């Protein structure tokens, strides 16, 4: 019974639409009607500012981490923490508190990985910010980090680097999360190909573009 309750709790944690609620409560703004229309960290930064964007990222990240740690906190045996983390990502992507229309799962997925394999998460953060510095595109950085996650989870155990051994469930979860993130960024990928993607004012390309509808 406790397992079912915690699994539901993991989904509900993921379902917290932090950007949407921050916009509505503190700014009287519906993020879905502004910028890209997304309720995640990037659009929150653009529309509501740095403080709101950072708050959104922190909440989205740590709701993934907390969900992953639930079975450890409650000394639950028999179910991998990754299953709880995956449910949080599903909740973030299809939140019951926001009409099942959620974000692109980047921050929450990172939080899940941090809760299970923090050094691997650090590796992905380096890849993410390296790609962001080179391309000035959050979407490109997210997709690049997703691909790097797949490469890392498959190759690192061969050399005992960062990951000491193969974990079939961790590999499956990484493949699932990477696929989800890439699919959720399909429109961004099209804009990258067309050279019309939104840029952030940081890195080698400091050009700023208005968010596209």
Swiss-Prot record:
InterPro entries according to UniProt: G3P_acylTferase_PlsY
Topology feature Cytoplasmic, residues: 23-51, 101-142, 185-213
Gene Ontology BP term (one): phospholipid biosynthetic process
Activity regulation comment: Inhibited by acyl-CoA and 1-acylglycerol-3-phosphate.
A Pfam family annotated for this UniProt entry: G3P_acyltransf
Effect in UniProt of substituting residue 102 to A: Defect in substrate binding
Cell compartment(s), UniProt: Cell membrane
Enzyme class: transferase
Effect of residue 104 to A: Loss of acyltransferase activity
Subunit relationships: Probably interacts with PlsX.
UniProt name for this protein: Glycerol-3-phosphate acyltransferase
Species of origin: Streptococcus pneumoniae (strain ATCC BAA-255 / R6)
């Amino acid at each position: 019974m406790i397992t079912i309750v915690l699994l539901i709790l993991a989904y509900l944690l993921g379902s917290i639409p932090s950007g949407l609620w921050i916009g509505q409560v503190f700014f009287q703004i519906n993020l879905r009607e502004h910028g890209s229309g997304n309720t995640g960290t990037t659009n929150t930064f653009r529309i509501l500012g740095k403080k709101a964007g950072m708050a959104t990222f922190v909440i989205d990240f740590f709701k993934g981490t907390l969900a992953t740690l639930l079975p450890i906190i409650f000394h639950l045996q028999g179910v991998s923490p990754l299953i709880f983390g995956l449910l949080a990502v599903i909740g973030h992507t299809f939140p019951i508190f926001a009409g099942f229309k959620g974000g692109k799962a980047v921050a929450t997925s990172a939080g899940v990985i941090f809760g299970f394999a923090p050094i691997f998460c650090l590796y992905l953060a380096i890849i993410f910010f390296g790609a962001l510095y080179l391309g000035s595109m959050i979407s490109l950085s997210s997709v690049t980090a997703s691909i790097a996650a797949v490469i890392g989870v498959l190759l690192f155990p061969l050399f005992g680097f960062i990951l000491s051994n193969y974990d079939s469930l961790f590999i499956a979860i990484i493949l699932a999360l990477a696929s989800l993130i890439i699919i959720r960024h399909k429109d961004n990928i099209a804009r990258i190909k067309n050279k019309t993607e939104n840029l952030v004012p940081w890195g080698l390309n400091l050009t700023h573009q208005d968010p596209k509808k």
